[in-house]
């Protein structure tokens, strides 16, 4: 650890500082203001003749990004969470003894506390003229050689802390993510929803069709599953009397990783008694309008080279109409299992002949429709067979009162009128068990306690989930989900695998 020559040199400098009575890791140094506040507060000097104000004695802090030694003076750039600032100090301003120590031992990556006044250099740069410079933290590992940051994308994800040090834009993206979560939370609170927390470890892998992570509870001696979705617990709360609830938290799915999938991801799920899925569409449009406004993005944003228009109302189209309009498929084809199988095989797509009609229609949708839904589009009336927790339509028992929101060819939200008939729910769980026994690893398991909860009566309720990660990808124009997750899942390095062997 810390055994290369550059790291060893820095360790020696840290030891030398200790010998000089300077702690390279002091327990507490208090800064007075951020660099942005310093710039904003003292920008008035730009309008003055002198372009300096020596009556100021402000204290700021930041990481050294660049040092330029010019004889008896040093110019340095420091950076904090928000911005950067040039600082200047000399033998005269900090004293010859301290200047000599700093000149010898300060390096890019070190964190410093600086006291001084604002001034403008001869080249016109707003700066801080330092009277005191204190080392707050000595960096042992040098920053990457390239000042503009890491170029290896894998290294950026594995060492996010270095990525954030070197790339201010990365920090800004995660500030946007934090703001998005905060805005969503306040939006639902202002609508009268109650934020709740439900279990992360479930006795049954349910709530959505996906392969779970399995763990073991030593004390109880039983298997537990990291939650796939919080849905069934949130609906239990509606049964219990909470009429509007939401939860922002992690979900886990033991599946592949790609540009839009990470094994652990963040969602908001919300349930609203005495409302229907059309109300959820209206609510979702309102939420997006708020986010775009508060983030100053306007009604049209760019994502992956495409311009997306968020003007209300969003397009609303049924599942089958979307197959015809966007998939270019005939109505008689999408209603005929044999014709669907033939179409899929002709176009080179895998087709399982054992799948029933609704699942085959889903294959059509995935292959011919989804990528064409660029502007926000609500697709409704899904096949009931792929919607095991949704309420059946009163007009057509083969249709679920369900919708999904697609933007730029990706699903962003899924909502439906909740199934509250306990007998119907029980029968659908039985069909899921049949599918699981037939080899469908993602099929739901029976949850008799949930069915029992429905037996006590759940009021007519609509529920929805929105993927926070994909939403932030959209709002920050990022192609990979790993760009919006601070510490995404990564494949083990070869060296890590060898150590385990």
UniProtKB/Swiss-Prot annotation:
It comes from Campylobacter jejuni subsp. doylei (strain ATCC BAA-1458 / RM4099 / 269.97). Mg(2+) 1 binds at residues 404, 411. InterPro entries: Aa-tRNA-synt_II, aa-tRNA-synth_II, aa-tRNA-synth_II/BPL/LPL, Lys-tRNA-ligase_II, Lys-tRNA-ligase_II_N, Lys-tRNA-synth_II_C, NA-bd_OB-fold, NA-bd_OB_tRNA. It is an enzyme of class 6 (ligase). It catalyses: tRNA(Lys) + L-lysine + ATP = L-lysyl-tRNA(Lys) + AMP + diphosphate. One of its GO terms (cellular component) is cytosol. Its cofactor is Mg(2+). This is Lysine--tRNA ligase. Mg(2+) 2 binds at residue 411.
